[in-house]
Swiss-Prot record:
One GO MF term: acetyl-CoA carboxylase activity
Pathway terms, separated by semicolons: Lipid metabolism; malonyl-CoA biosynthesis; malonyl-CoA from acetyl-CoA: step 1/1
Function: Component of the acetyl coenzyme A carboxylase (ACC) complex. Biotin carboxylase (BC) catalyzes the carboxylation of biotin on its carrier protein (BCCP) and then the CO(2) group is transferred by the transcarboxylase to acetyl-CoA to form malonyl-CoA.
Pfam families per the UniProt record, alphabetical: Carboxyl_trans (PF01039)
EC top class named in words: transferase
Organism of origin: Rhizobium rhizogenes (strain K84 / ATCC BAA-868) (Agrobacterium radiobacter)
Protein name: Acetyl-coenzyme A carboxylase carboxyl transferase subunit beta
Amino acid sequence: MNWITNYVRPRINSMLGRREVPENLWIKCPETGEMVFHKDLEDNKWVIPASGFHMKMPAKARLADLFDKGEYEALQQPKVAQDPLKFRDSKKYTDRLKDSRVKTDQEDTIVAGVGKVRGLKLVAVVHEFNFMGGSLGIAAGEAIVKAFERAIAEKCPLVMFPASGGARMQEGILSLMQLPRTTVAVDMLKEAGQPYIVVLTNPTTGGVTASYAMLGDVHLAEPGAEICFAGKRVIEQTIREKLPEGFQTSEYLLEHGMVDMVVKRHDIPDTLATLLKILTKAPANDVSAKSLNGAAAPLVANG
């Protein structure tokens, strides 16, 4: 062995050898196939620049983007029983929870915070879809109820950003019990005279759609979001008929009066601020139509 084999050859091999590239370095647009560098996607609020396709946005990133200067008080995750049913399918439920916590750096699917949007104080609640599909379980239900209680105590509006596959099957009937619990929480906020706005994101389905996601005073939706109770494939297999093109999308639901506005992600903070000033009866000179005019679709009155 000599310096050629000890030094030169390893250097050449390292230069010519295959380098490992992280899987998430480039993101592919599901609509056009365009490849976008992950940093560019994050800087553009997880919206594909060319196609305008709205990718799923991490919950903490959404809160930071929503609140003025990214500043807010994070609400603590309530302590609840872990795996009360001792559920196990192909994998232990506790192991699924551990994997999701490592993946998302969250205790469960709900992240909530108190802060200001264009100077207006509010509580925001966001689902993290990457945590077991944003499913609604005991922990998520308790976090949502606590967020509503905080909004009532602070005498401020609450804005919900659902992104969920529905009730968490690993918690059975205990998961389904969160539907009436969260519904009661919505009623409590309305009785307190505070507005409740829902921003429907992709996807919003199942028991979440059947409860607090469709109980807002105003419903906004991001472009192209899937919003439904049962999925398109399940319905088609049940009725044995082909459903219309674009069925269960934000735009389809807007046309049929199920949502009030379809709003691009970049316009959401301004639109929320304008709507909340109207709903809270702020002085007329404080209310601007600028954000509403910049929305993807006009405000539609239902009924």
